Amino acid sequence: MRVAMYYSNRDVRMEEIPTPQIGPGEILMRVEASGICGTDLLEWYRLHKAPLVLGHEVAGVIAASGEGVEHYKVGDRICAAHHVPCNTCHYCLSGHHTVCDTLRQTNFDPGGFAEYLRLPGINVEQGIFSLPDEVSFEEATFVEPLACVLRGQKLANLQPRQSVLVIGSGVAGLLHIQLARNSGVDYIMATDIVDYRLEAARKFGADVTVHANEYIPGCIRQTTGGRLADLVVICSGAESAINQALESVERGGTVLFFAPTEPGISIPISVNDLFWRNEITLTSSYGGSPADYAVALELIRAGKIRIREMITHRMGLAEIGLGFKVVALAQDSLKVIIEPQR
């Protein structure tokens, strides 16, 4: 089968490898759509593992099922989680499923940028979701990123009538905007350095958009009657985004560290200025649990999140190198979908 083998952001090669063989309890998925995620381009995180087949935002059709698979059949339309928890360890029982050791060890074989992938037994048991007829394959690729956003806002304890600042208006930021708007918040400000994405932020529900080079705390105060943001969501890995977030959070508010940064970046905290008498909460989130996936899929099915308008590029598997360039440039683009069957 054809795969897109990742060597670096500038070197993604079409290669042929054997189609995975499945065993008892496993499923072979024919991949119909796979989204390029910004984390696919984190060379500091990916290069030491290369060469490898990336792609974790996937949807497709069951091409074969192993002995003992009971709840799914060949031809079923599905999306799948690449990481799944054990549901029995200390972390899972504490509600922190996405820091489970099992979750960190599970994955697809080989990855979503391939014509086919193998779903191991534990993924079949906990990480497969049947697609309703009204959800397309390309829409289903958003289940994974939306699940991550859901988990982040849950851990940040987002409440109705709060004010929200989203720093970085890429795909994750736009999903945060839409989900926060669905949650009944009073006010959303979004920032970015790209005008195209600021326009997208307004389109998807931000009340105010501001270029990230502006003095963000001052802009918030001007539009909220003097208050800062109750929740600040950092959807940019830039060090400047962290500084902006810490300066922009209201007393009693929360900063959610959602996007990863390069290694070595630290948080510039003045403990007294930030915490003493201010009750500021700093929190983070990683990934989504199977329960988050289920909620995300239902939101998409119900039309609560506008997915199709976020897809700006659709490409065949052989065009994935161009897809990586489009995502890396981050200009007139949002989500790039790869269709491995063409």
Residue spans for each PLM region:
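C-terminal hydrophobic helical "lid"/dimerization subdomain
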Residues: 3, 243-247, 290-342
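Glycine-rich phosphate-binding loop and adjacent beta-alpha segment
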Residues: 238-302, 339-342
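A short acidic, Gly/Pro-enriched loop at the edge of an enzyme's catalytic core
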Residues: 220-229
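Mid-domain Rossmann-like dinucleotide-binding core that forms the NAD(H)/NADP(H) cofactor-binding site
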Residues: 135-214, 218
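Glycine-rich beta-strand-centered segment in the early N-terminal region that forms part
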Residues: 18-34, 45-90, 132
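Residue-level marker of beta-strand positions
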Residues: 57-59, 77, 91, 116, ...
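NAD(P)H dinucleotide-binding glycine-rich loop of Rossmann-like/cofactor-binding domains
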Residues: 86-167
